[in-house]
């Protein structure tokens, strides 16, 4: 199985059919630089009349491999997440699944001029709003912890200074109208946060509403 080479810079990926293109998100940090034994999932940005559609192509996907999700950055989360839920369920429910196989989002590191990947195998998506302890990423760089407005560079310090009396789980939530590009950038921020406060856990559940 061929692998993605980190030397290749791809701001757009091309499918095998119809010369469709996908505009990838861009970021300045690489989480994972290379994924082997993979197969691709494509989610294209498609317009039909006045409607935007998430057009999924998983014809070349093999359940036993790592899946790389190549998703157009222009798509809103409200269209992307339902497709992710269906694809995760299909892979998880397959009799041929490989417990060691993971799922990754692809994006472009525009500083190093390389491809990069963000693992999300353990993420479980929920369409709805968490009741407590919620980090919320909204439009126009809005960031809140519960009702407290924050700057993104304040988030790690705020979490680690929370006053807690027992083990607490923090849930991450996103505005359903965020672009996939914004989502990936915010996911990278969350990935970089180091929790030093004993008893605080970041949940694998991600809410979209």
Describe the function of each predicted region:
Residues 1-4:
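Positively charged n-region of N-terminal signal peptides that target proteins for export
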Residues 12-15:
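C-terminal motif of bacterial Sec signal peptides marking the signal peptidase cleavage site
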Residues 17-209:
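Long, low-hydrophobicity, acidic/polar, solvent-exposed interaction domains
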């Amino acid at each position: 199985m061929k692998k993605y080479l980190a030397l290749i810079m791809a701001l757009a990926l091309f499918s095998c059919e119809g010369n469709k293109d996908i505009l990838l998100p861009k970021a300045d940090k690489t989480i994972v630089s290379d994924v082997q034994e993979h197969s691709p999932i494509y989610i294209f940005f498609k317009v039909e009349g006045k409607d935007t559609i998430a057009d999924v192509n998983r014809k070349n996907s093999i359940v036993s491999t790592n899946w790389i999700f190549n998703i157009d950055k222009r798509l809103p989360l409200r269209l992307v997440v339902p497709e992710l839920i269906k694809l995760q369920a299909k892979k998880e429910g397959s009799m041929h699944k490989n417990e060691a196989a993971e799922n990754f989002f692809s994006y472009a590191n525009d500083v190093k001029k390389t491809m990069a990947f963000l693992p999300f195998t353990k993420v479980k998506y929920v369409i709805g709003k968490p009741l407590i302890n919620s980090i919320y990423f909204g439009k126009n760089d809005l960031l809140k912890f519960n009702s407290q407005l924050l700057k993104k560079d304040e988030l790690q310090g705020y979490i680690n200074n929370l006053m807690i009396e027992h083990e607490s789980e923090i849930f991450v939530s996103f505005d359903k109208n965020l672009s996939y590009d914004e989502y990936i950038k915010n996911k990278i921020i969350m990935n970089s946060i180091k929790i030093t406060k004993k008893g605080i856990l970041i949940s694998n559940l991600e809410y979209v509403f």
